[in-house]
Amino acid sequence: MLDREGYRPNVGIILTNNRDEVFWGKRVREHSWQFPQGGIKPGESPETAMYRELYEEVGLLSQHVKIVGRTRDWLRYDVPNNWVRREWRGSYRGQKQIWYLLRLTGRDCDVNLRATRHPEFDGWRWHQYWAPVDEVIDFKRDVYLGALKELSSRFLRGMESYEDFAARQLSGNR
């Protein structure tokens, strides 16, 4: 299901622990890492899609997390043509996403990457809040950074800004 502009509605999930570290999933049989995300089905609300994707990709249920916040608007990224299925070329531009910031209220052992028959991830780790941005595939990077910035400034009081984090990394003070 695409909107008029060629974007597929989607949700992204930034799952944090009590140390404000983020869940980082390793894609099955790949060396790439990302946040959980997935499409919104027709008739499904973004929140319902978020809980479905959270279970399908991470094995967590609503009782394992608390919604801290979500982005105000859709964040969009274009997918390069060489990444688009041949049958979609010409109509598909990319994804538009509502991002959710969640707090894990359960335990690490509640994570189950094999909750469904078609796992998205075969590994996971907790990561510093800002650190994953540089590891994201380049065409998604601005959306990831935009979501992390908006959600941290609105909902994570006292969180170091991305600019301060980046300056610290450049100076070698990790």
From Swiss-Prot:
Locate the transmembrane regions by residue number: none
The entry sums up its family as follows: Belongs to the Nudix hydrolase family. RppH subfamily.
Answer whether the UniProt record assigns the keyword Plastid to this protein: no
Major enzyme class = hydrolase
Known PROSITE patterns for this protein? Answer: NUDIX, NUDIX_BOX
The organism of origin for this protein: Neisseria meningitidis serogroup C / serotype 2a (strain ATCC 700532 / DSM 15464 / FAM18)
GO MF terms, alphabetically ordered = pyrophosphatase activity
The entry's function note states: Accelerates the degradation of transcripts by removing pyrophosphate from the 5'-end of triphosphorylated RNA, leading to a more labile monophosphorylated state that can stimulate subsequent ribonuclease cleavage.
From the Swiss-Prot or TrEMBL record, give the protein name: RNA pyrophosphohydrolase
Positions occupied by motif Nudix box: 38-59
Q: Which cofactor does it need?
A: a divalent metal cation
Give the organism's phylogenetic lineage. Bacteria, Pseudomonadati, Pseudomonadota, Betaproteobacteria, Neisseriales
